Each structure stands twice: as C-alpha cells, then as structure tokens.
C-alpha cells in the first residue's frame, strides 16, 4: 500500500473505474439505480439493505460501508447519515449519493484517509427517509409555488414531529430522579408512529450507533440537542430558551466540526439569519417536540445533530456541484469524530462479554451501555474523567482515564460477581457464547489490536 499522507491528498480524485454520480436530482428509481451501481462497483466494502417501506411501499434503502459489511466488529463504532426526512428538503439526499460514490471511488484510489475510515468505522447512509414526500416535491421541482409541498409523508405527517416524546419523561426525571438514558417507549408506540418513523426506530434499536447526523434544508446551521424547550417556547424573534443536554459542550464541538469544515456555514450569516459559529441549540432557535435527534440521545447510545444545509429547500440542479464542494470535507470530518472519547470491552471474571452494562462518567448525567458484543463507546472531549462500569449482579468498577485528542482511549472493564446478591445477567454472543462470528477474509486480515488503539488520522 503506498504511503500517501492524508493531509496532502486531494479529497476529490476521479477514478478511471468509477462513473461519478452526476450533479442532478435523482427521483426514486434513479436513486435506487445509483445505490446499486455504487454497491456493484465496490462490493467488498458495501452492503445495500432496506429498513422498511414508506406509506406508498417504497423501500428505505441504506448503503453500508465497512471492510466487513454486514458484520459488527467489536470495538468498531457504527455511524449513520440520514437524508431527506422532509421530502422537499433535498440537498442532503443528493449529498449522500455523492458521498457514497466518493467513498467507493477513493477507497479504490487507495486514499489512505478513506481506507482507514472504512477499515475502522461501519458507516450507514440512508439517503431518503421520506421517498414519498420527495416524489411530490420533485413533481414541482426547484420552482416551488408551495414552500411546504412534499414536506410530510404520504399520510400528511411531519416525520420530525413523529417520534415518541421522551423529553418530557427526561425533564421529569432530572428533577425527581429516574433514568437518564435508554428511556423506555410506551407499549403502544408502534401504533402511534408512521411507517417511516417505525422503520428508523427499529433500525437504530438494532445497531449500536454512536454518532449520527440528520440532514435538512431551509437554513445553513448545525443544530444540536435538545430541540424541545424546557419552557415550551416556540419560534419567535428572540432566542432565549436554550435547552442544553448533559453533553452540551461535546455537542457544540461536534456541531462546530461540521460548520468550520463547511465552506461557509461557520461564517454565521446565511439565509438572512445569524448563528454564531454557524451552530445553534435546537430549542434556542425554536422548540419542537417528538424530533429525531432528541430521540436518538434519550433512547439509544447515539449522539445525533441536525444539519440545515441550504437556504433553498430544493436547490437548482446547477447549484449541486457547489454544494457538494462546500460540504465534502465536513461530511468526512464529521464521520471521523466517532473516533474520540473512550471505548472498550465489559467482561465478567471468566472473560465473557457482558451486554447492557452501564458506563457512567462522573459529572455528566447521561450514561451509555455496552452492546450485544460487550463493547461500549462513550464520546468525550479531551480531559481526565472518572468512569464507572456496572451491571446487575456484579460489583461496579471505577477508573480514572485521560482522553487525548488523537483518538479513542481504550478502557476495558472486568467485573467481579457480587458476593452479596446474585442476579441473572446477559452475556453477549461470542467468546464461547454463540452468535454470528466474524469470518475474516484471508486477503484482508487485520490485527485485532488495531481496533483497540487507532482511529482515523
């Protein structure tokens, strides 16, 4: 493999093997063909799958990039991009198609930065969460007479106001005591949400996502949780109702990573509005209930932000190349942010993987849990932290760990069974526990230690 420092690699290199995605709007059939084309051009590092159907039966396709597609490798984080949640906000959809082609192309070009990203990260790209709404908006095209035409799904529901409301539950718990993570869903949640929302919820419950971005249009700003205001205020002339999460500093940093890598988002003045550093707390801008980014944070291990990417919800075709060039580096840098903080394995005395162990950081009232393979990921900024792992039936263990800026710090926990109480405990598949084991490809073997000690450059 040639030694090509990523700092000097141009991000956009044309490959003689890959036909680039053209800068045009892609209707549903065209989108599907494009995803299949990218998959066929890079079959060893991609998997195309669907997470469900829209109201009108269109598949919600996801393109996965990984050196072992379809398999979760312990200590390798999962990250996702979601586009076109509002059917008439289309730039995210087109950017994600361009990104898919770009990752495939640059992997084949042996771009060291992209090679490392795909080898150390499992990336899931959902270009269109609302294909039915898109088709309605696309029938009008950029010259829209109705600003909201196609925004909702085929049942007329705004999908970003359709997730179970967990904020109210969390705000109550914050004052009165109660869980601060993985808040439960109501028993009837499946009957209360739309097919597209249900598909996404089942998707994010099935994979241990660590980081995510959700793409919108109509402004240019990186929006971070919470979206729902404690004061129940709605959009108005004054932004005074900031509703920070316990991870507010981290979320601001994630938002700034995107805004400052973007061509112009960080400048602040865009679309006739001003956001310092090109970022905003969601509720400080305007409060919304039942949004997707708050749901990710309160119900799963995933940290999600919302990216408003264009003043025009449906940009003209001739603007797409400029938008891609303005977003390309930001899209890559944001994916790389999943490799920060701490990660590790939670084991019992016999070195069996433990799933569902709770990882707490002193001073941050938001916990994460270990996944079904016993691995956990906790995004943190550089600093020194006191971290505790605990599981029912085991004595908790606390360590002090220093997190640096160059990549994740590996912190494993081996928990001893409590002598005073005995509880049933879940053990994750693997290490003699069954389940689907990774079958390494002999042509691309990796040293397992690389998963523990490195992240993208």
Curated annotation (Swiss-Prot):
Q: Which keywords has UniProt assigned to this entry?
A: Carboxypeptidase, Disulfide bond, Glycoprotein, Hydrolase, Metal-binding, Metalloprotease, Protease, Secreted, Signal, Zinc
Q: Where in the cell? A: Secreted, Extracellular space
- Give me the disulphide-bonded residues: 42-104, 271-311
* Biological-process GO terms, alphabetical: bradykinin catabolic process; protein catabolic process; proteolysis; response to glucocorticoid
**The protein's Enzyme Commission number:** 3.4.17.3
Cellular component (GO) terms are: extracellular space
Q: Where is the signal peptide?
A: 1-23
Gene Ontology molecular function: carboxypeptidase activity; metallocarboxypeptidase activity; zinc ion binding
The job of this chain, per UniProt, is described as: Protects the body from potent vasoactive and inflammatory peptides containing C-terminal Arg or Lys (such as kinins or anaphylatoxins) which are released into the circulation.
To which protein family does this belong? Answer: Belongs to the peptidase M14 family.
Protein name as catalogued: Carboxypeptidase N catalytic chain
Species for this entry: Mus musculus (Mouse)
Which gene carries the instructions for this protein? Cpn1
